[in-house]
Amino acid sequence: MDIRSDDAKKPMMMWFLGMLLFSMVAESNAQLSENYYASTCPSVELIVKQAVTTKFKQTVTTAPATLRMFFHDCFVEGCDASVFIASENEDAEKDADDNKSLAGDGFDTVIKAKTAVESQCPGVVSCADILALAARDVVVLVGGPEFKVELGRRDGLVSKASRVTGKLPEPGLDVRGLVQIFASNGLSLTDMIALSGAHTIGSSHCNRFANRLHNFSTFMPVDPTMDPVYAQQLIQACSDPNPDAVVDIDLTSRDTFDNSYYQNLVARKGLFTSDQALFNDLSSQATVVRFANNAEEFYSAFSSAMRNLGRVGVKVGNQGEIRRDCSAFN
């Protein structure tokens, strides 16, 4: 979709609003530090890495599950581990419809890492920081870039399913819709495109993109922006009426963190509408092409975007708490 010149200022306006929001929380973000636990739990990164690696060796879904959980957590209430809270009434953040598909392996990864950390540094390291470290570690385990993680987040005291609605990008969004959501969290267009590259690993239920394969429009049953051969592959893969049927988001290298996601977009093989829109829209197309042609440029942008994501809505200082159990408030 090309954005008309009359509308071109709207995404830019959202970026400026997002940057304003980001500057408003800069003071609290400044309290994050790469060596935050240098004196209180100096081995925290090694402890988390060992726990994550052990879990990853048990199942490769650990990587996409943990990375996706970090994204979902940060976009609702900020990066504060609010997505881990369990509620008997099933009204916590994790119970929202948009979070019900979060894989159990993501929860298990952080819980096991938290247990390992608590055995060495009881009551010191937040679940939010452990999730941030685990998200970095799984990226490295599947071949992605290694980057420094800022620490010092506190765990949140609020977790409500009702606050999730509208906070997470849907697979049917266009670039304008994506920009609005990311900018509301202080993230730029480049951040959004780079973070979308996390779709190079993981899978999706067929119902999340079925509208592109069947009854797309009155005259076109299949989305015309999708490569026809790829469309037939998906139709065949999703022929099973089982609602739990899944396909890999990146059919070329599902378990490797690389830039093939962007190469697929250039070839019109993006799984979600929101994926393919990144190439179809002129405001994001050039960046997609750069990332498709240069893996190192993508890795650099992704590393920067992950650090920016990790600063969203953080609780620091006297805000929040250090949970003893990630699934329950103290």
UniProtKB/Swiss-Prot annotation:
* Documented EC number(s): 1.11.1.7
Molecular functions (GO terms): heme binding; lactoperoxidase activity; metal ion binding
Q: Which GO terms describe its biological process?
A: hydrogen peroxide catabolic process; response to oxidative stress
- Write out the annotated subcellular location: Secreted
Tissues where this protein is expressed = Slightly expressed in roots.
Q: Which residues of the sequence carry a binding annotation for Ca(2+) 1?
A: D73, V76, G78, D80, S82
At which residues is there a site annotated Transition state stabilizer? R68
| Active site as annotated | H72
Q: What is this protein called?
A: Peroxidase 55
Organism name: Arabidopsis thaliana (Mouse-ear cress)
The gene designation is: PER55
